[in-house]
Design a protein with these regions (language model features):
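Alpha/beta enzyme core
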Residues: 3-14, 26-52, 57-76, 85-173
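Short catalytic-loop micro-motif centered on adjacent basic/acidic residues
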Residues: 19-23, 81-82, 103
């Protein structure tokens, strides 16, 4: 059952339990995560990077695969399909493809541009019943061949982005 991530995380907060996000890269990983979540009776967030989406021939393919597997495997636990660290353009592709949650990584933009793009995406996502995460500062690590040092987010900038109505905030620490 595909749901937006905010709904499941609100229930988790009220019930005092955690929800895992697992990035998927192919059919086998997706099947393993879905079956394990079902076996454990645990909601789950399936994260998809832009690189993984490209590898799996596009976000529409990913969305169709997850929806078909959810149905054919008889998954009854809540499942969110979430774009992980997406570009502005990637967010729109995932919205069109049927994802239930997006993450806009505007951390590389000046704060004014990050705010403008995040504001627009919050309006579109919420208008369609999707959850949205935004980033301030940069999270260190390597993904899709890009290595980031990480950068501490300015607390005032975090508040500015949070006040836009995002459902989750990723703050570089």
């Amino acid at each position: 059952m595909l749901v937006n991530a905010k709904e499941m995380l609100d229930k988790a907060r009220a019930g005092k339990y955690a929800v895992g996000q697992f990035n998927i890269n192919n059919l086998e990983w997706t099947k393993a995560v879905l079956l394990t979540a079902q076996e454990l009776n645990s909601p789950v967030i399936l994260g998809v990077s832009e690189g993984a989406g490209k590898y799996m021939t596009g976000f529409e393919t990913v969305s169709a695969m997850v929806a078909a597997m959810d149905k054919s495997l008889g998954i009854t636990v809540p499942v969110a399909l979430h774009l992980d660290h997406g570009t502005y353009e990637g967010c729109y592709k995932c919205i069109k493809a049927g994802f239930t949650s997006i993450m806009f990584d505007g951390s590389h933009f000046a704060i004014d541009e990050n705010i403008a793009k995040t504001t627009e995406l919050v309006s579109v996502a919420h208008g369609l019943g999707l959850s949205i995460e935004a980033e301030v500062g940069s999270i260190g690590g390597e993904e899709d061949g890009v290595i980031g040092r990480g950068e501490c987010a300015d607390p005032d900038e975090c508040k500015m982005i949070a006040d836009l109505g995002v459902d989750f905030l990723a703050a570089g620490i």
